[in-house]
């Protein structure tokens, strides 16, 4: 998957975890850069502040699903890998996680 500057990034997460959990955290990292992914909304709720990681409480995850949108706003001089890491959280501890890498370039 390739991402371009200012392009809307759309993601879908389904939690298939049988144990108890409080919510999920989505962390992102643009490798080789200090820039951030800008979160726009999740499950139809606008995000008004700039956050480096997105926590979604289980209470707002109908059917254990989250849909989100984000963007990357800077113009890269080179290609970057972008890591999306989602963790299932129970009582402030990570119980499971999954990662996805995508390519970011102009």
Regions found by a protein language model. Give the residues of each.
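C-terminal beta-sandwich interaction modules and adjacent acidic
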Residues: 1-106
